[in-house]
Amino acid sequence: MIPVVALVGRPNVGKSTLFNRLTRTRDALVADFPGLTRDRKYGRAFLSGYEFIVVDTGGIDGTEEGIETKMAEQSLAAIEEADVVLFMTDARAGLTAADLSIAQHLRSREKTTFVVANKVDGIDADSACAEFWSLGLGEVYQMAASQGRGVTNMIEYALTPYAEAMGIVRQGEDEVTEEREYTEEEAEAEQKRLQDLPIKLAIIGKPNVGKSTLTNRILGEERVVVFDEPGTTRDSIYIPMEREGREYVIIDTAGVRRRSKVHQVIEKFSVIKTLKAVEDANVVLLIIDAREGIAEQDLGLLGFALNAGRALVIAVNKWDGIDQGIKDRVKSELDRRLGFIDFARIHFISALHGTGVGHLFESIEEAYDSATRRVSTSMLTRIMQMSQDDHQPPLVNGRRVKLKYAHAGGYNPPIVVIHGNQVSKLPDSYKRYMMNYFRRSLKVVGTPIQLRFQEGDNPFENKTEKLTMSQERRRKRAQSHIKDRKTK
């Protein structure tokens, strides 16, 4: 699973500055979907090849009554759930009583902790940081978060233990060729292999929207404790099941509540668990309460699922028992506020009575198949050429932008890499046109599709392809399926 990094410290030591710097690479993705809000406390970051969830825990006001009462419950929860804690201090202000109390709490939790002395720009950093060694948490790492100094080195060092285990691609490796080219026959065989794997389905949403009720309806038994009170699911529950010959792993996540409404520490843990479940899933099923409409929390969860590139299905629950006027208003609100995700199927269901639940799986399978479908290089290049024939790229400085070659750059979500001349100058309107053209041509439903543009000629032309070990294993699996099919 993707690691979680918690930023801990007293107020005004630079936690939010570091959070914004780490997560800003994802802002552009969110901006691609107008009307979408994001949760400023939880973010998905990508730095130096490492991908992780970063949590800004908020500050601690004082120490008079002890760390347990002064640290926000959300901060306690984040520390418990985090894989790595960055304990941030202010090198200019020096060591404070609050720093000592926080350090005492962190030592008692035995978490992997790194002391960060922030704001070292313009001062004698070594002298200013010396006193922080007395915290008893090991080495003190110098940083100037506002300028980005020391940030990359800190993250690389903190997350090194997760690199090999998680198969993280380090920056500098060629991400474009990470997914090898498929022939038509190999793509078909690989798709068949993927259809035999269980679909990991994360059911997410605010508390009390009916996630556990829906899980029980799907399973046909009381597998998840359900009470008519928000937050009764304490942890993400992984439940294997089979339906009409297809295997699934249902991930029933604890509800995400507004921070102002969360009073029990155990319930706050569920926020991070939900975000980690999204990362672990193939398909995300977002449940919305028909009686409450679309809340900001719904949009925040939606944004995280989109940023993670997960296939998506939306279910509007509790559709039974409301009058037609309310139904019309809900549908109008969905059209107005969720028009930017027109690729996702929307279902109106009653988890309690089972109305419409069966049709969910048609969309879930459709979304999974679209997100993981292997497409040959020749097919992608043909579609690219057809899009040019139907609508030529614009002129740039009197020269026509020329698209030469397309190939797959990744899956779940599908990524198409397009090579050509002056592609960096293509207007957003033409990029959207091409994205929609690929979506229609490939019949991609239920998943975002990403286009990446690279300058230059076909990088594979007149070049012998050297496969990585993982690519070689995938090639052998595809060839094995082809042989098995031919012998039958």
From Swiss-Prot:
GTP 1 binds at residues 9-16, 56-60, 118-121. Residues 473-488 have a biased composition (Basic residues). PROSITE patterns: G_ENGA. Gene3D superfamilies: 3.30.300.20, P-loop containing nucleotide triphosphate hydrolases. CDD domains: EngA1 (cd01894), EngA2 (cd01895). Keywords: GTP-binding, Nucleotide-binding, Repeat, Ribosome biogenesis. It comes from the Bacteria. GO terms for molecular function: GTP binding; ribosome binding. Residues 373-457 form the KH-like domain. One of its GO terms (biological process) is ribosome biogenesis. PANTHER family: GTPASE DER. This is GTPase Der. It comes from Shewanella baltica (strain OS155 / ATCC BAA-1091). The lineage of its organism: Bacteria, Pseudomonadati, Pseudomonadota, Gammaproteobacteria, Alteromonadales.
